[in-house]
Protein backbone atom coordinates (compact mmCIF):
# COMPACT_ATOMS: atom_id res chain seq x y z
CA UNK A 1 0.00 0.00 0.00
CA UNK A 2 1.40 3.39 -0.97
CA UNK A 3 1.38 6.31 1.40
CA UNK A 4 -0.99 8.18 -0.88
CA UNK A 5 -3.70 5.55 -0.48
CA UNK A 6 -3.90 5.97 3.29
CA UNK A 7 -6.82 8.11 4.50
CA UNK A 8 -7.77 9.37 7.93
CA UNK A 9 -10.84 7.11 7.88
CA UNK A 10 -8.48 4.11 7.72
CA UNK A 11 -7.05 4.93 11.14
CA UNK A 12 -9.97 6.75 12.79
CA UNK A 13 -12.92 5.57 14.82
CA UNK A 14 -16.19 7.24 15.86
CA UNK A 15 -18.07 6.97 19.14
CA UNK A 16 -21.71 7.79 19.72
CA UNK A 17 -22.70 9.81 22.76
CA UNK A 18 -24.18 6.66 24.25
CA UNK A 19 -20.92 4.75 23.82
CA UNK A 20 -18.82 7.64 25.10
CA UNK A 21 -20.56 7.74 28.48
CA UNK A 22 -19.41 4.16 29.21
CA UNK A 23 -15.73 5.01 28.83
CA UNK A 24 -13.64 5.67 31.90
CA UNK A 25 -11.53 8.91 32.04
CA UNK A 26 -8.31 7.02 31.28
CA UNK A 27 -9.93 5.42 28.23
CA UNK A 28 -11.16 8.80 27.00
CA UNK A 29 -7.65 10.24 27.37
CA UNK A 30 -6.27 7.31 25.41
CA UNK A 31 -8.83 7.86 22.65
CA UNK A 32 -7.90 11.55 22.35
CA UNK A 33 -4.19 10.72 22.23
CA UNK A 34 -4.55 8.08 19.55
CA UNK A 35 -6.83 10.14 17.31
CA UNK A 36 -4.73 13.31 17.47
CA UNK A 37 -1.45 11.45 17.01
CA UNK A 38 -2.71 9.43 14.06
CA UNK A 39 -3.88 12.62 12.38
CA UNK A 40 -0.48 14.19 13.10
CA UNK A 41 1.25 11.17 11.60
CA UNK A 42 -0.59 11.57 8.31
CA UNK A 43 0.04 15.33 8.15
CA UNK A 44 3.76 14.94 8.95
CA UNK A 45 4.14 12.63 5.97
CA UNK A 46 2.86 15.32 3.64
CA UNK A 47 -0.46 13.65 2.85
CA UNK A 48 -3.02 16.09 1.49
CA UNK A 49 -5.95 15.73 3.88
CA UNK A 50 -8.36 18.25 5.37
CA UNK A 51 -8.79 18.39 9.13
CA UNK A 52 -11.75 16.17 10.13
CA UNK A 53 -14.43 17.58 12.42
CA UNK A 54 -13.65 15.05 15.14
CA UNK A 55 -10.02 16.25 15.29
CA UNK A 56 -11.15 19.85 15.69
CA UNK A 57 -13.46 18.83 18.52
CA UNK A 58 -10.71 16.90 20.30
CA UNK A 59 -8.24 19.78 19.93
CA UNK A 60 -10.77 22.08 21.61
CA UNK A 61 -11.28 19.60 24.45
CA UNK A 62 -14.87 18.95 23.42
CA UNK A 63 -16.72 15.64 23.32
CA UNK A 64 -15.95 13.73 20.11
CA UNK A 65 -19.27 12.19 19.08
CA UNK A 66 -20.35 13.35 15.63
CA UNK A 67 -23.71 14.83 14.63
CA UNK A 68 -26.97 13.46 15.98
CA UNK A 69 -26.46 9.93 14.74
CA UNK A 70 -28.85 7.65 16.62
CA UNK A 71 -27.54 4.25 17.52
CA UNK A 72 -30.28 2.05 18.93
CA UNK A 73 -28.34 -0.36 21.10
CA UNK A 74 -28.95 -1.54 24.61
CA UNK A 75 -25.31 -2.01 25.53
CA UNK A 76 -24.70 -4.84 27.99
CA UNK A 77 -28.20 -4.78 29.52
CA UNK A 78 -28.77 -7.38 32.22
CA UNK A 79 -31.71 -9.45 33.37
CA UNK A 80 -31.92 -9.75 37.15
CA UNK A 81 -32.42 -13.22 38.58
CA UNK A 82 -31.73 -15.15 41.74
CA UNK A 83 -28.30 -16.30 42.77
CA UNK A 84 -24.98 -14.51 42.42
CA UNK A 85 -25.90 -12.48 39.34
CA UNK A 86 -24.07 -9.15 39.14
CA UNK A 87 -24.63 -6.03 37.05
CA UNK A 88 -22.81 -6.40 33.75
CA UNK A 89 -21.68 -3.18 32.07
CA UNK A 90 -18.37 -1.90 30.64
CA UNK A 91 -17.40 -0.48 34.03
CA UNK A 92 -17.17 -4.06 35.37
CA UNK A 93 -14.71 -5.07 32.68
CA UNK A 94 -10.96 -4.72 33.09
CA UNK A 95 -9.46 -3.68 29.76
CA UNK A 96 -5.83 -4.03 28.74
CA UNK A 97 -5.07 -0.31 28.35
CA UNK A 98 -1.39 -1.01 27.68
CA UNK A 99 -2.03 -1.08 23.92
CA UNK A 100 -3.33 1.76 21.80
CA UNK A 101 -5.22 -0.83 19.78
CA UNK A 102 -7.73 -0.79 22.64
CA UNK A 103 -9.32 2.28 21.08
CA UNK A 104 -8.44 1.58 17.45
CA UNK A 105 -10.39 -1.68 17.57
CA UNK A 106 -13.40 -0.13 19.38
CA UNK A 107 -12.53 -1.07 22.96
CA UNK A 108 -13.82 -4.64 22.74
CA UNK A 109 -11.91 -6.05 19.78
CA UNK A 110 -8.87 -7.22 21.73
CA UNK A 111 -11.09 -9.11 24.15
CA UNK A 112 -11.55 -7.86 27.70
CA UNK A 113 -9.80 -9.53 30.60
CA UNK A 114 -12.39 -11.01 32.91
CA UNK A 115 -10.10 -11.34 35.91
CA UNK A 116 -12.64 -9.79 38.29
CA UNK A 117 -15.54 -12.17 37.53
CA UNK A 118 -16.31 -14.28 40.59
CA UNK A 119 -19.85 -15.54 40.16
CA UNK A 120 -22.28 -16.28 37.34
CA UNK A 121 -23.29 -13.70 34.76
CA UNK A 122 -26.57 -13.59 32.85
CA UNK A 123 -27.17 -11.43 29.77
CA UNK A 124 -30.26 -11.05 27.58
CA UNK A 125 -30.41 -13.11 24.41
CA UNK A 126 -30.20 -10.45 21.73
CA UNK A 127 -28.11 -9.50 18.73
CA UNK A 128 -27.87 -6.17 16.92
CA UNK A 129 -25.52 -5.11 14.15
CA UNK A 130 -23.80 -1.76 14.60
CA UNK A 131 -23.92 0.76 11.76
CA UNK A 132 -21.18 1.27 9.17
CA UNK A 133 -19.57 -2.10 9.67
CA UNK A 134 -18.36 -1.12 13.13
CA UNK A 135 -18.99 -4.34 14.95
CA UNK A 136 -21.49 -6.69 16.47
CA UNK A 137 -22.42 -7.15 20.12
CA UNK A 138 -24.22 -10.41 20.86
CA UNK A 139 -25.89 -11.03 24.21
CA UNK A 140 -26.44 -14.56 25.44
CA UNK A 141 -27.27 -16.30 28.66
CA UNK A 142 -24.20 -17.69 30.39
CA UNK A 143 -23.65 -19.05 33.86
CA UNK A 144 -19.89 -19.34 34.26
CA UNK A 145 -16.89 -17.04 34.08
CA UNK A 146 -14.91 -18.97 31.45
CA UNK A 147 -17.96 -19.47 29.22
CA UNK A 148 -18.70 -15.75 29.17
CA UNK A 149 -15.09 -14.81 28.53
CA UNK A 150 -14.84 -17.28 25.65
CA UNK A 151 -18.12 -16.10 24.14
CA UNK A 152 -17.26 -12.40 24.36
CA UNK A 153 -13.78 -12.88 22.90
CA UNK A 154 -15.29 -14.57 19.83
CA UNK A 155 -18.49 -12.63 19.31
CA UNK A 156 -18.06 -9.05 20.48
CA UNK A 157 -16.83 -7.54 17.21
CA UNK A 158 -17.38 -8.49 13.60
CA UNK A 159 -14.08 -9.21 11.78
CA UNK A 160 -14.77 -9.61 8.07
CA UNK A 161 -11.15 -9.26 6.87
CA UNK A 162 -9.16 -12.52 7.12
CA UNK A 163 -5.45 -13.21 6.58
CA UNK A 164 -4.85 -16.02 4.06
CA UNK A 165 -1.50 -16.88 5.67
CA UNK A 166 -2.50 -17.52 9.28
CA UNK A 167 -6.28 -17.14 9.37
CA UNK A 168 -6.28 -14.18 11.77
CA UNK A 169 -9.26 -11.85 11.23
CA UNK A 170 -9.65 -8.09 11.60
CA UNK A 171 -12.46 -5.58 11.80
CA UNK A 172 -10.78 -3.14 9.42
CA UNK A 173 -9.16 -3.58 6.04
CA UNK A 174 -6.29 -1.32 7.05
CA UNK A 175 -5.56 -3.50 10.10
CA UNK A 176 -5.35 -6.53 7.81
CA UNK A 177 -2.92 -4.70 5.50
CA UNK A 178 -0.68 -3.84 8.44
CA UNK A 179 -0.80 -7.42 9.70
CA UNK A 180 0.09 -8.92 6.32
CA UNK A 181 3.37 -7.03 6.38
CA UNK A 182 4.49 -9.33 9.20
CA UNK A 183 4.37 -12.14 6.64
CA UNK A 184 5.72 -10.28 3.60
CA UNK A 185 8.29 -8.16 5.41
CA UNK A 186 7.09 -5.11 3.46
CA UNK A 187 8.27 -1.77 4.87
CA UNK A 188 6.91 0.96 2.59
CA UNK A 189 7.63 3.96 4.81
CA UNK A 190 11.22 5.21 4.48
CA UNK A 191 13.01 7.87 6.52
CA UNK A 192 14.35 10.62 4.26
CA UNK A 193 17.22 11.32 6.65
CA UNK A 194 18.82 7.88 7.04
CA UNK A 195 16.88 5.59 4.70
CA UNK A 196 15.61 3.28 7.45
CA UNK A 197 12.27 1.70 6.51
CA UNK A 198 9.19 0.84 8.56
CA UNK A 199 6.01 -1.17 8.11
CA UNK A 200 3.77 1.40 9.84
CA UNK A 201 3.42 5.17 9.61
CA UNK A 202 3.43 5.60 13.37
CA UNK A 203 6.80 3.87 13.70
CA UNK A 204 8.30 6.13 11.02
CA UNK A 205 7.04 9.26 12.76
CA UNK A 206 8.42 8.08 16.09
CA UNK A 207 11.77 7.36 14.44
CA UNK A 208 11.91 10.81 12.81
CA UNK A 209 11.85 12.38 16.26
CA UNK A 210 15.45 11.15 16.61
CA UNK A 211 16.54 13.43 13.78
CA UNK A 212 14.38 16.45 14.57
CA UNK A 213 14.40 16.25 18.36
CA UNK A 214 10.93 17.77 18.22
CA UNK A 215 8.96 17.61 21.47
CA UNK A 216 5.86 19.75 20.97
CA UNK A 217 3.92 18.76 24.09
CA UNK A 218 4.97 20.71 27.19
CA UNK A 219 3.99 20.19 30.82
CA UNK A 220 2.66 23.42 32.34
CA UNK A 221 3.79 22.40 35.82
CA UNK A 222 7.49 21.74 35.20
CA UNK A 223 8.02 22.75 31.52
CA UNK A 224 9.22 19.27 30.60
CA UNK A 225 8.53 18.47 26.94
CA UNK A 226 7.43 15.25 25.25
CA UNK A 227 7.26 13.89 21.73
CA UNK A 228 3.75 12.49 22.18
CA UNK A 229 0.62 13.72 23.87
CA UNK A 230 0.12 10.33 25.52
CA UNK A 231 3.55 10.65 27.18
CA UNK A 232 2.59 14.10 28.49
CA UNK A 233 -0.69 12.80 29.93
CA UNK A 234 1.14 9.98 31.72
CA UNK A 235 3.75 12.44 33.02
CA UNK A 236 1.12 14.86 34.36
CA UNK A 237 -0.08 12.15 36.70
CA UNK A 238 3.19 12.57 38.62
CA UNK A 239 1.94 16.05 39.54
CA UNK A 240 -1.73 15.23 40.14
CA UNK A 241 -1.14 11.87 41.81
CA UNK A 242 -3.88 10.31 39.69
CA UNK A 243 -3.74 6.51 39.51
CA UNK A 244 -6.60 5.31 37.30
CA UNK A 245 -5.43 1.71 36.85
CA UNK A 246 -6.41 -0.44 39.84
CA UNK A 247 -5.54 -4.06 40.57
CA UNK A 248 -8.70 -6.09 41.18
CA UNK A 249 -6.84 -8.54 43.42
CA UNK A 250 -5.35 -6.21 46.04
CA UNK A 251 -6.72 -2.77 45.18
CA UNK A 252 -3.32 -1.22 44.50
CA UNK A 253 -3.55 1.60 41.94
CA UNK A 254 -1.10 2.73 39.28
CA UNK A 255 -0.65 5.75 37.04
CA UNK A 256 0.29 3.61 34.03
CA UNK A 257 -1.45 0.59 32.54
CA UNK A 258 1.90 -1.08 31.88
CA UNK A 259 2.76 -0.88 35.59
CA UNK A 260 -0.56 -2.51 36.46
CA UNK A 261 0.11 -5.32 33.97
CA UNK A 262 3.56 -5.87 35.48
CA UNK A 263 2.13 -5.83 39.01
CA UNK A 264 -0.62 -8.35 38.22
CA UNK A 265 2.04 -10.96 37.42
CA UNK A 266 2.86 -10.98 41.14
CA UNK A 267 -0.53 -12.53 41.91
CA UNK A 268 -0.23 -15.29 39.33
CA UNK A 269 3.49 -15.87 39.86
CA UNK A 270 4.18 -15.59 36.16
CA UNK A 271 7.87 -15.20 35.26
CA UNK A 272 8.28 -16.62 31.79
CA UNK A 273 11.38 -14.66 30.74
CA UNK A 274 14.47 -16.62 31.82
CA UNK A 275 18.12 -15.59 31.45
CA UNK A 276 20.12 -18.34 29.75
CA UNK A 277 23.31 -17.22 31.46
CA UNK A 278 22.28 -17.46 35.10
CA UNK A 279 18.76 -18.88 35.05
CA UNK A 280 17.18 -15.86 36.74
CA UNK A 281 13.52 -15.36 35.78
CA UNK A 282 11.72 -12.10 35.05
CA UNK A 283 8.13 -11.00 34.62
CA UNK A 284 8.72 -8.95 31.46
CA UNK A 285 10.95 -9.06 28.42
CA UNK A 286 12.25 -5.55 29.10
CA UNK A 287 13.44 -6.60 32.56
CA UNK A 288 15.25 -9.58 31.04
CA UNK A 289 16.96 -7.41 28.42
CA UNK A 290 18.03 -4.94 31.11
CA UNK A 291 19.42 -7.82 33.17
CA UNK A 292 21.31 -9.42 30.28
CA UNK A 293 23.36 -6.26 29.83
CA UNK A 294 24.98 -7.04 33.20
CA UNK A 295 26.45 -10.18 31.61
CA UNK A 296 27.52 -8.66 28.29
CA UNK A 297 28.69 -5.29 29.59
CA UNK A 298 26.93 -3.69 26.62
CA UNK A 299 26.27 0.05 26.82
CA UNK A 300 23.98 0.80 23.87
CA UNK A 301 23.00 4.36 24.81
CA UNK A 302 25.69 6.84 23.75
CA UNK A 303 25.83 10.58 24.39
CA UNK A 304 26.22 12.46 21.09
CA UNK A 305 27.99 15.32 22.89
CA UNK A 306 30.88 13.48 24.55
CA UNK A 307 30.58 9.86 23.43
CA UNK A 308 30.05 8.45 26.92
CA UNK A 309 27.93 5.29 26.85
CA UNK A 310 25.35 3.96 29.31
CA UNK A 311 23.49 0.73 29.96
CA UNK A 312 20.12 2.39 30.49
CA UNK A 313 18.36 5.14 28.57
CA UNK A 314 17.37 6.86 31.83
CA UNK A 315 21.05 7.14 32.78
CA UNK A 316 21.83 8.74 29.41
CA UNK A 317 18.99 11.23 29.86
CA UNK A 318 20.27 12.17 33.31
CA UNK A 319 23.82 12.55 31.96
CA UNK A 320 22.76 14.76 29.03
CA UNK A 321 21.55 17.43 31.43
CA UNK A 322 25.24 18.09 32.18
CA UNK A 323 25.70 19.46 28.67
CA UNK A 324 22.70 21.77 28.89
CA UNK A 325 21.99 24.63 31.25
CA UNK A 326 18.42 23.47 31.73
CA UNK A 327 17.47 23.03 35.39
CA UNK A 328 13.78 22.07 35.46
CA UNK A 329 13.52 21.14 39.14
CA UNK A 330 13.04 24.24 41.31
CA UNK A 331 12.91 24.48 45.09
CA UNK A 332 9.71 26.14 46.33
CA UNK A 333 11.54 27.53 49.37
CA UNK A 334 14.51 29.36 47.82
CA UNK A 335 13.83 29.05 44.04
CA UNK A 336 17.15 27.30 43.48
CA UNK A 337 16.96 24.99 40.43
CA UNK A 338 18.54 21.59 39.80
CA UNK A 339 19.20 19.28 36.85
CA UNK A 340 17.99 16.14 38.60
CA UNK A 341 14.94 15.56 40.77
CA UNK A 342 17.07 13.57 43.25
CA UNK A 343 19.30 16.65 43.76
CA UNK A 344 16.23 18.73 44.55
CA UNK A 345 14.99 16.17 47.11
CA UNK A 346 18.36 16.18 48.87
CA UNK A 347 18.51 19.97 48.79
CA UNK A 348 15.08 20.27 50.40
CA UNK A 349 16.37 18.35 53.38
CA UNK A 350 18.40 21.46 54.24
CA UNK A 351 15.17 23.47 54.63
CA UNK A 352 13.75 20.65 56.75
CA UNK A 353 16.50 21.27 59.30
CA UNK A 354 18.89 18.44 58.46
CA UNK A 355 22.59 19.28 58.63
CA UNK A 356 23.77 18.69 55.08
CA UNK A 357 26.67 19.96 53.00
CA UNK A 358 25.93 21.42 49.58
CA UNK A 359 28.35 21.89 46.67
CA UNK A 360 28.46 25.53 45.51
CA UNK A 361 29.34 24.46 41.96
CA UNK A 362 26.56 22.02 41.09
CA UNK A 363 24.20 22.02 44.09
CA UNK A 364 24.78 18.37 44.96
CA UNK A 365 24.19 17.65 48.66
CA UNK A 366 26.20 15.39 50.96
CA UNK A 367 25.57 14.02 54.43
CA UNK A 368 29.24 14.23 55.45
CA UNK A 369 31.59 17.19 55.10
CA UNK A 370 34.41 14.85 54.04
CA UNK A 371 32.26 13.65 51.14
CA UNK A 372 31.77 17.24 50.01
CA UNK A 373 35.52 17.91 50.13
CA UNK A 374 36.13 14.77 48.08
CA UNK A 375 33.45 15.78 45.57
CA UNK A 376 34.78 19.33 45.04
CA UNK A 377 37.97 17.82 43.63
CA UNK A 378 35.95 16.68 40.63
CA UNK A 379 35.38 20.37 39.83
CA UNK A 380 38.90 21.64 40.61
CA UNK A 381 40.70 18.70 39.02
CA UNK A 382 42.89 18.35 42.11
CA UNK A 383 44.67 14.98 42.43
CA UNK A 384 46.71 15.00 45.63
CA UNK A 385 47.35 11.25 45.82
CA UNK A 386 50.35 10.33 43.63
CA UNK A 387 51.82 6.89 42.99
CA UNK A 388 55.49 6.65 44.04
CA UNK A 389 56.18 4.11 41.29
CA UNK A 390 54.87 5.87 38.19
CA UNK A 391 53.80 9.35 39.43
CA UNK A 392 50.22 8.78 38.33
CA UNK A 393 47.89 10.92 40.48
CA UNK A 394 44.41 10.33 41.84
CA UNK A 395 41.71 12.40 43.51
CA UNK A 396 40.94 9.68 46.06
CA UNK A 397 43.25 7.73 48.33
CA UNK A 398 41.30 4.54 47.71
CA UNK A 399 41.87 4.90 43.96
CA UNK A 400 45.60 5.12 44.64
CA UNK A 401 45.50 1.94 46.76
CA UNK A 402 43.74 0.06 43.98
CA UNK A 403 46.22 1.35 41.42
CA UNK A 404 49.27 0.31 43.47
CA UNK A 405 48.20 -3.32 43.17
CA UNK A 406 49.21 -3.19 39.50
CA UNK A 407 52.78 -2.66 40.74
CA UNK A 408 52.82 -4.91 43.80
CA UNK A 409 50.82 -7.77 42.28
CA UNK A 410 48.68 -7.95 45.41
CA UNK A 411 45.52 -10.02 44.98
CA UNK A 412 43.57 -9.87 48.24
CA UNK A 413 40.29 -11.29 46.92
CA UNK A 414 40.33 -15.11 46.99
CA UNK A 415 37.71 -17.49 45.58
CA UNK A 416 36.53 -19.89 48.31
CA UNK A 417 35.85 -22.61 45.76
CA UNK A 418 39.11 -22.86 43.78
CA UNK A 419 41.43 -20.51 45.74
CA UNK A 420 42.08 -18.34 42.69
CA UNK A 421 42.94 -14.76 43.73
CA UNK A 422 42.12 -11.39 42.19
CA UNK A 423 43.16 -7.75 42.54
CA UNK A 424 39.60 -6.47 42.30
CA UNK A 425 36.45 -7.58 44.12
CA UNK A 426 34.47 -7.10 40.90
CA UNK A 427 36.71 -9.60 39.10
CA UNK A 428 36.16 -12.11 41.91
CA UNK A 429 32.40 -11.66 41.62
CA UNK A 430 32.56 -12.30 37.86
CA UNK A 431 34.74 -15.36 38.41
CA UNK A 432 32.40 -16.86 41.01
CA UNK A 433 29.64 -17.00 38.42
CA UNK A 434 31.65 -19.59 36.50
CA UNK A 435 31.18 -21.97 39.41
CA UNK A 436 27.47 -21.30 39.88
CA UNK A 437 26.70 -21.44 36.16
CA UNK A 438 28.75 -24.48 35.14
CA UNK A 439 27.60 -26.80 37.89
CA UNK A 440 25.44 -25.10 40.51
CA UNK A 441 24.52 -28.29 42.37
CA UNK A 442 28.12 -29.46 42.71
CA UNK A 443 29.10 -25.98 43.88
CA UNK A 444 26.41 -25.83 46.55
CA UNK A 445 27.37 -29.26 47.91
CA UNK A 446 31.12 -28.67 47.89
CA UNK A 447 33.18 -28.49 51.10
CA UNK A 448 34.63 -25.08 50.25
CA UNK A 449 31.16 -23.63 49.68
CA UNK A 450 29.92 -24.80 53.06
CA UNK A 451 33.05 -23.60 54.84
CA UNK A 452 32.65 -20.23 53.13
CA UNK A 453 28.98 -20.13 54.15
CA UNK A 454 29.82 -21.02 57.75
CA UNK A 455 32.52 -18.35 57.84
CA UNK A 456 30.10 -15.77 56.41
CA UNK A 457 27.36 -16.62 58.90
UniProtKB/Swiss-Prot annotation:
InterPro entries: KRAB (IPR001909), KRAB_dom_sf (IPR036051), Snail/Krueppel_Znf (IPR050527), Znf_C2H2_sf (IPR036236), Znf_C2H2_type (IPR013087). PROSITE patterns: KRAB, ZINC_FINGER_C2H2_1, ZINC_FINGER_C2H2_2. It comes from the Eukaryota. One of its GO terms (biological process) is negative regulation of transcription by RNA polymerase II. Residues 6-77 form the KRAB domain. The keyword Zinc applies. One of its GO terms (molecular function) is sequence-specific DNA binding. One of its GO terms (cellular component) is nucleus. Its main location: nucleus. The keyword Nucleus applies. Gene3D superfamilies: 6.10.140.140, Classic Zinc Finger. A zinc finger (C2H2-type) spans 161-183, 189-211, 217-239, 245-267, 273-295, 301-323, 329-351, 357-379, 385-407, 413-435. Seems ubiquitous. Seen in the heart, brain, placenta, lung, liver, skeletal muscle, kidney and pancreas. It is found in: Nucleus. Keywords: DNA-binding, Metal-binding, Nucleus, Repeat, Repressor, Transcription, Transcription regulation, Zinc, Zinc-finger. May be involved in transcriptional regulation as a repressor. This is Zinc finger protein 140.
Amino acid sequence: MSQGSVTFRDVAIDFSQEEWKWLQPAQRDLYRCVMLENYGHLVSLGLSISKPDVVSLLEQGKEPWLGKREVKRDLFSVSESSGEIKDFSPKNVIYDDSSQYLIMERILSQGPVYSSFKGGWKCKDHTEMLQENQGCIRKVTVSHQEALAQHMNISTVERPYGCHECGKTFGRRFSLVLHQRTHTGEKPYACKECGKTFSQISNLVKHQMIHTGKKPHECKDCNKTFSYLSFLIEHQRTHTGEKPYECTECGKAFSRASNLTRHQRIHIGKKQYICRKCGKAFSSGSELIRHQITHTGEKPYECIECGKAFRRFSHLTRHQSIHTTKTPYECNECRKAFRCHSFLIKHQRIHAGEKLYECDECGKVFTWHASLIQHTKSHTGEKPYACAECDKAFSRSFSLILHQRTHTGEKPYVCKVCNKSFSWSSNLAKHQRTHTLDNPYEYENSFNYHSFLTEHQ
